[in-house]
A protein has these predicted regions:
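Non-catalytic terminal/linker segments enriched in charged/polar, low-complexity residues
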Residues: 1-122, 149-152, 316-322
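Hydrophobic positions on the alpha1 helix immediately C-terminal to the Walker A/P-loop
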Residues: 139, 143, 169
């Protein structure tokens, strides 16, 4: 018989964590490991019942996990320095990784305050920029779904009317929500849309694919920002080459874009390259997209979410290798 896989639980108090264990795994659950991290209590547990349907996959060490996920030597060195400074070196891999990413994220600029943006008296506009194939159109639709789930009906517009493919795709994605897509062909159209948009509205603007090595396209971003008076988000595709990703981030920086999101996290086992490039820059990682379906809305880039994705991707690659 194979041992049950371990499950991780974390909370403010031991009682809270044990309640989660009992609720999830039942009264026969067995505590495997326990400890404290960043003021929280954590435990790993197994269900206590044998299950031969799933092989036990041991949790890799944090160093192994970061290396397998493609993180740069700089990040590996930083982690080793961080880990050696911790008193409890035998802590669970997941807990140590979460603490490490919390430390990294705390060193980044503050995340965008969406609630404050919604409270503004003027319309709030957001637009996604990036090269062709980065997921701008699908992510725009995902944000529309996310806002609707919060009880906010967004206004969705598209500047991608020359190639028309992006516009048709966005219209098809939002048709099920009975949400129309405004077409914008010029900067004047952006001004007109915002002029007739009520205060407290949320405007999402899809943009055409850019040549990220063309100064003219950097100017286009500045023009969009000036007219939309909004916040641009750069999109990075997970799994790309580290050097190329760093060059794209340089393009964003030169275009005064400081907030980025990562897409296609579900399609790669190499999250380390894009995350290394972001964490080595002044960029703020705002969200992660781990599903091609618009119903699966963007995930806020919390430390535990990043670690869950890393664990999932490495375990998947090991299963295929076996």
């Amino acid at each position: 018989m194979q041992q049950q896989p371990t499950h991780f639980f974390e909370g403010k108090t031991l009682k809270e964590v044990l309640d989660h264990v009992t609720h999830s795994l039942g009264e026969e659950a067995v505590i495997w490991e326990s400890g404290e991290s960043e003021g929280n209590v954590w435990v790993t547990a197994i269900s206590g019942q044998e299950d031969s349907s799933q092989p036990h996959i041991p949790l890799p060490s944090p160093e192994e996990l970061l290396e397998e996920a493609g993180f740069s030597p700089e990040i590996l060195t930083n982690f080793c320095s961080f880990a050696s400074s911790r008193r409890k070196k035998s802590a669970d891999s997941r807990a140590r990784l979460i603490a490490f990413f919390k430390k990294i994220l705390a060193q980044r600029p503050s995340s965008f305050d969406f609630d404050a943006a919604l409270a503004q008296e003027a319309p709030t506009s957001f637009f996604l920029v990036g090269a062709t194939g980065q997921g701008k159109t699908v992510t725009t639709a995902k944000f529309a779904v996310s806002l609707i789930q919060q009880g906010i009906l967004p206004i969705v517009a598209s500047l991608d009317v020359i190639k028309s493919g992006g516009l048709f795709q966005l219209e098809a994605l939002l048709q099920t929500l009975d949400l129309p897509v405004q077409t914008l062909q010029t900067q004047k159209d952006i001004r007109s849309l915002l002029a007739k948009t009520p205060s407290h509205a949320f405007v999402l603007i899809d943009t055409p694919g850019l040549n990220l090595f063309d100064a003219a396209d950097r100017r286009r971003i500045q023009e969009w920002r000036a007219e939309a008076q909004g916040t641009p988000f750069g999109l990075l595709r997970a799994g790309g080459d580290l050097r190329e990703t760093e060059e794209i981030i340089d393009f964003f920086r030169e275009a005064d874009i400081t907030r980025v999101g990562v897409t296609h996290c579900d399609a790669t086992q190499r999250l380390g390259t894009v995350l290394s490039a972001i964490f080595s820059s002044p960029m703020t990682l705002e969200f992660l997209c781990d599903s091609p379906f618009i119903s699966q809305t963007p995930q806020t880039a919390f430390a535990d979410k990043i670690v869950d994705m890393l664990l999932s991707s490495v375990k998947s690659s090991r299963k295929r290798a076996a």
